[in-house]
Amino acid sequence: MKDDNLYGEGWCWDDDNPVLSPLLVSRKDAFVGRFVDMLREAGIVVDASLGEARKPSDAFCICHRFHTMDQVLLRMLKDSDNLYAEAMFYQLAASSGNRPATAKDARSVVRHLVTKLGLRADGYAFADGSGLSLYNYVSAELEMAMLKYAYRNNNIMLHLRPSLPIAATDGTLRHRMSGPFTNGNVVAKTGTLTGISSLAGYCKSANGHDLAFVILNQGLRHTRNGRAFQDKVCQELCRP
């Protein structure tokens, strides 16, 4: 489904690019070697050249393994797993119907959503799926629009809310916001780059209203300062 590019897009020439081959084993591009080793251990000898290529038209499926969207979302959001985020990015690309799925296709899908939200897609840049690329450019306005769009669509929230980290409970918020107003009352996605920290999600106010929020802290010398600020904002949003 994905293109045969070994690496993703959106990286500088001197970056340590993560491998994004569709056939990863323990996050390493070692599927073919591992597969052959297991065949040998089972007493099966393969007398042929081995490698990765397009499936022949006369090939047939022996075993089919897949993960549900919820399984991917849970790992991607709760644990902030960048590999899973890239996998979701190319899943978006596949939804366009193009084969093989490319980063360009994924960006097209995202831009279509931005336009649907009433914003100008050419005002933003989407380089990768994980958000690690320095070539990404988004705003709090865009993230808020997406949060509101998701909230108003139950078929999205049904999958999104259970996948977000919960304050003082699990995921990347497990050790944050343990106070009486925020504990279990904030669900949000964290984001961290050098000098940057962000938090975006939902919380419930004292009157029972659901609130969406987006906090982007930039120019930080210490990430903990940004996180402390975010936690305090959430505390005030939830305070009676």
Role assignments for model-derived ranges:
Residues 1-154, 158:
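A small/polar active-site loop signature that marks catalytic segments
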Residues 89-240:
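Small-residue-rich helix-loop
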